[in-house]
Every structure is written in C-alpha cells, then in structure tokens.
Amino acid sequence: MKLKVGVQLFSVMTELANDYLKTLENVAKAGYKYVEYVDVPGNSPEEIGNKVKELGLTAIASHVHFDPFTSTQEDMVKIVEDNVKMHSEAIILPMGIMTTMEEIKTVAAACNEMAALAKAHGMAFYYHNHCQEFYQVEGKTAYEWLVELTDPELVFFEVDTFWATRGGQKAVELIKKLGSRAKLIHQKDMGKSADPINLIEGVTDLTRENYCEKIFGRTNPTDICTVGTGIMDIPEIVKTVTELDYAPYIIVELDSCARQTEEEYNTPLSPLASIKASREYLESVIG
C-alpha cells in the first residue's frame, strides 16, 4: 500500500485561528487531500465538516481536548458527536502526562473508555506521543505501560517520530515493536539546534507539575524544521512504514517550527509554504 501524505492542521494554527474555513481552502491549494483536525474555537463542527466535504478532503482524524484526569462522560460524548459532524475517521488523544503507575493506569482506562465510545460511532481511537512518555516508571517507560494496559483491539498509536527520537527512542524500532497498533505516523524534521536530542536522559523526579519545565523547557523553536531539511533519516522511516504496511498515512506536523529552508538555515518559510515543501519532499521519498 502506497503511503498517503496528510497534514496536521496545528501546522497552520495561526491561520486557522484567523479564518478556519479559508485556511482549509489554502491547505487544499497546497496539494493536500488528507487533513487531521486540531481543536480551534470558532466555527461549528457542521461548518467544518461541510467545508471539508466541499473541498473533497478526507478528515483522517482529530486531535481533541480530552483530559484523562478531568474529562467527564458527558465531555467524551460531546467530543465524539462533534467529530461525527466533522466527518472525522478517528479521535486522537494528543498527549498524556504520566509519571507514576497510578497516573498511567488512569490514562490507560480513559483511553479504553474513549476508544469504545469512538468505535460505537464508527471511529477509531489513537494515542499520540510526545517525549515525556518515555520516562521510566517501575522498570518500563510510561509508553510501554500504556501499550500494555490498553485494549489492543480498540486503542491504536499515532507515532510521532520526532518526539519519539527526543524521548531516546529509535523511531523505526518503536514502529516495528508496535506492529499493527501503529496505524498513523506523524512526521516533522529535526533542526541542527536540537541539543540535547534525548530530552529524557538524566531527568529525575518528573511530575505532572514540573514536566514542562524539565523537558520542554530545554527545547527551541528551531529544533523543528520543514520535512526534508533537517537531520532525521526520513527515508528509513518511510521504508519501514511502507514495508510493515499497517499505516496508510504519514502526516506532516510542524508544531511551532521556524520552518527553515534547506538552502539557508534559520530563514523561515511561511507555514503554508512549509507544509507544501514538506509534502513534496515526502512524496518524492515515497515515489
């Protein structure tokens, strides 16, 4: 199965906040047919869903405001119902902060519950990693515990290869280990400024209160760059995902990147130009 290139709309967050529907048009003009939602206040689910259909886009999934520690059953039902109206194929928990076994169990239980609800409405459920999940808790990483404690028939994983790398993992090995549960791939590229690459190494006494300072406080916007202009071995990732044949999409996500050009590091592209260049690069690698 040939990989399809999608885009996480967080990559154009400022544009979305200014005019969500116009930005969808511009994303389509940038050559994208597959999009992944990010939750932005403003337009109704119906308006967004109708626009996506009008443009002939496929809504791969949606990163949602779902907190495993505070979201109620009512909150979860609304999330699912809104995403049905948006024609989303899946719901994704963008990140979880788990630094103790009790917290891991809470996140796992919430994922199982949301996944069952999503399935009942014809949608899949995924967990998207950053790097803090690769902190060790009782002999394993929190991520390993999450994989073990979630229902393999309901909970799948969107592997963010950049953040996995910054968690001290080899992205291709993580994808291989997850096997058929790794059904979506997030791809950005790593700038030369990323130092240290492994943000977890040496971190101790991590908590839900201090994780942002201890981990993300050591990052820089230029750590993330346009796909194909950084130091990640993206052809190896594409080759691995293609050979395994579990994930139909590789999704560009550029976070708050400086979007450097290959020719002149630190010269930013606009977000729309950057996602276009990223798509073109990935499609050239996929062939």
Residue ranges with predicted function:
Residues E36, A61, I92, Y126, ...:
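Conserved beta-strand positions in the central sheet of alpha/beta enzyme cores
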Residues E25, Y34, P41, P68-F157, ...:
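Active-site acidic/histidine proton-transfer and metal-coordination neighborhood
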Residues M1-A28, K53, D82, H87, ...:
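Histidine-acidic metal/acid-base catalytic patches
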Residues S44-S62, H121-M123, P268:
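Short acidic, glycine/proline-enriched helix-loop-strand junctions
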Residues M13-N18, Y34-E47, H65-E74, I97-K105, ...:
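Acidic-and-aromatic substrate-binding clefts and catalytic sites of carbohydrate-active enzymes
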